[in-house]
Regions:
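Active-site entrance/lid segments in N-terminal catalytic domains of soluble metabolic enzymes
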Residues: 1-118
Length: 118
């Protein structure tokens, strides 16, 4: 690792840089570029239909072998479909934002992934 601190250790990245999960601007290309550069790339799922999210996750996995994450806004109308895709695609790190849901998140809690609420 280039820098050793709690962030780099927690996410297994080289640089303590976490890309924001920006709705329209942070698809697979930006996320994989940030991850390949040593930071934590994040796919912003807020503007994506479920199958578009799946495509972005799969393309990220093809473009990098390094850790990446998905930012999942809790206000998204098809939240459960997004959660199912994140589980099926075995996304290693998930950030949830824009609120807290009391139901529907149990499947994420059961997965072996890192989950953070923003």
């Amino acid at each position: 690792m280039l820098f050793e601190n709690r962030i780099t250790s927690l996410f297994k990245i080289d640089l303590p840089i976490i890309q924001a999960g920006m709705v329209w601007a942070s698809g697979w290309e930006l996320a994989s570029a940030v991850s390949n550069a040593g930071g934590l790339g994040i796919i912003g799922a807020g503007s994506m239909y479920p199958e578009v999210l799946r495509t972005h996750i799969q393309k990220t996995k093809t473009a990098t072998t390094k850790p990446f994450a998905v930012n999942l806004p809790m206000l998204y109308p098809d939240l459960q479909a997004h959660i199912n895709i994140i589980i099926e695609e075995k996304v290693p790190i998930v950030f949830t934002s824009a609120g807290i849901k009391k139901h529907g998140l149990q499947p994420l809690k059961k997965m072996e992934l890192q989950w953070y609420m923003l």
